[in-house]
Swiss-Prot record:
UniProt protein name: NAD(P)H-quinone oxidoreductase subunit M
GO MF term list: oxidoreductase activity, acting on NAD(P)H, quinone or similar compound as acceptor; quinone binding
Lineage of the organism: Bacteria, Bacillati, Cyanobacteriota, Cyanophyceae, Synechococcales
Domain of life: Bacteria
Organism: Synechococcus sp. (strain CC9605)
TM spans (from-to): none
Length: 115
């Protein structure tokens, strides 16, 4: 079993080399745990959530067999952050007007008035 928990934290993505057991993260050499949008800045529907989870799986599969390092986690986290931005810009994801944070961290909402 792994002794050290590696993690990557971006604004909307948190990755851990751990398994979630009950409410605790337990370090693991062979499992990554994804915490998506911990501040609830976006409104997620099943389709957009599935797209991010699918992209996460693609990135993990592409990195399989390589060294699991801080660098690898940062690459995956940064790529997911960019993918979330693409979804937002395409109108497949929107900001949560009831979220505790309203700083439009990925740009202003795309509305007909602003286009």
């Amino acid at each position: 079993m792994a002794d050290t928990l590696l993690k990557c934290t971006t604004r909307h993505v948190r990755l851990f080399t751990a398994a979630l057991q009950e409410e605790d993260l337990v370090p693991s050499d062979d499992q990554l745990t994804l915490d998506l949008d911990p501040d609830n800045e976006f409104l997620w529907d099943a389709a957009s959530l599935a797209k991010v989870q699918g992209r996460f799986k693609e990135l993990v599969d592409a990195a399989a067999g390589g060294e699991l390092s801080d660098y690898t986690l940062r690459r995956i986290g940064t790529d997911l952050e960019g993918f979330i931005r693409q979804l937002l810009q395409a109108g497949e994801l929107s900001y949560n007007p009831d979220g505790r944070v309203q700083n439009f961290s990925m740009g202003l909402p795309r509305t007909p008035e602003l286009l």
